[in-house]
Amino acid sequence: MIIRDEINNFLEAEFPQINGDYEIINFSNENISILNHISQKHLRPGGTVSGPTMFALADVSFYIAILANIGTHRSVVTTNCNIDFLKKPSPVNLIAKPRIIKLGKSLIVGDVFIYSEGINEPVARANLTYSYR
């Protein structure tokens, strides 16, 4: 497993467009949590966090979990992502908890639960598959 600083440096260099949006708040062998800093640009009418914001958080957080396990390979790509919106999220920061279920030779399968900060029930659940070489 690589260290948090390596992942942060990689993301800053390769994905400067997301700098400041996401923060790794927990980073250990079995437990990674990513905070999405929510601002007005992430809200939709009705004062709730938009679906595309939650989808992006699921994708980014699972990507970080993969990097933590296999290193900063640039040939890692999303091949599938399905998301279930379970509950209206509060207009606060979101926390994603990614989990790798299977790390195969060329595919990685897992899920991500997304929570409104300070609330224990998930607001969304995503299932993801990535391809890598």
Regions found by a protein language model. Name each.
Residues 1-35, 40-41:
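Non-catalytic linker/capping segments at the edges of enzyme domains
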Residues 20, 30-32, 51, 75-81, ...:
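A generic structural signal for short beta-strands and their flanking turns/coil linkers
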Residues 36-38, 85, 132:
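Hydrophobic residues in beta-strands and at strand termini
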Residues 39-57:
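A conserved, well-ordered hydrophobic junction motif at loop->secondary-structure transitions
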Residues 52-72:
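Active-site helix/loop of acyl-thioester processing domains in fatty-acid/polyketide metabolism
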Residues 65-95, 100:
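Hydrophobic beta-strand-centered segment that forms part of the acyl-chain substrate-binding groove
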Residues 89-91, 95, 101-133:
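HotDog/MaoC-like acyl-thioester-processing domains
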